[in-house]
Amino acid sequence: AHSDAVTPLPARSKV
């Protein structure tokens, strides 16, 4: 998941 815009909530997993 590089794009947090396409990811739901668990987008913080990229950081």
UniProtKB/Swiss-Prot annotation:
Cellular component per GO, a single term: extracellular region
Superkingdom of source: Eukaryota
Keywords: Cell wall, Secreted
Annotated compartments: Secreted, Cell wall
Main location group: secreted
Listed name of the protein: 24 kDa cell wall protein
Organism: Daucus carota (Wild carrot)
